[in-house]
Amino acid sequence: ENMPLYYTYKGSDLDSLHIALEQYAVSDSYDKHLEYLKRFPYRNLFKEYDAKVITSEYLIENIEYSFKVWRETPWGKYVSFDNFCEFILPYRIKDEPLTHWKKDFYHRFKPVLDSLYQGTDVVEATSCLSNYATSLHWKYQNELTGPHLSAQLLLELQLGDCTSIADFGCYMLRSVGIPAGIDTYLWSPVSHVAHVWNVV
């Protein structure tokens, strides 16, 4: 019912941002001609609305994987249908490009979680998976920001600011049946800037 509100940004400046991030991931720097992206030019982008491009196959895949993880996890029986719908089922987070992230992240992280934890405590499962994610050595950078990055790009680069880290965490947790969301400080009393993090 909310699909008409959701969209992905498109445009050549977004392609340039991805190139700059890929360069930064390798060398901690990027081409000087891309420095204009520090003040990301949203005005040059257009919105591609989900309702016009999303396929039934995409939605079915998302629904099937969502129900699969809800049913197969030991803590799934403690997750209400309402919480499932809000914190596991969604096919997107914000304005990121649509990808088959739920299937891809499931096959990437479900074996990891299975090797780390076999119990029924969702908080302990989250802790084990979060500790594993820390070992991936995420590279923090907040010079280049723009629309939300795709789940696949985050998995490939493991690079970005706290928004990207929270998005990655949300994809990872939801893909294995852990109900997760993102909370926000519009202004942190500690850092005096906005901050986001995952909640379970």
Which stretches of residues belong to each language-model region?
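N-terminal accessory/pre-domain segments preceding catalytic cores
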Residues: E1-N131, S135, S175
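Hydrophobic/aromatic-rich core segments of domains that either
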Residues: P111, S115-T120, A125-Y132, Q141-Q152, ...
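Mature, folded catalytic cores of secreted/periplasmic enzymes
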Residues: E48, V53-S56, I60, W138-K139, ...
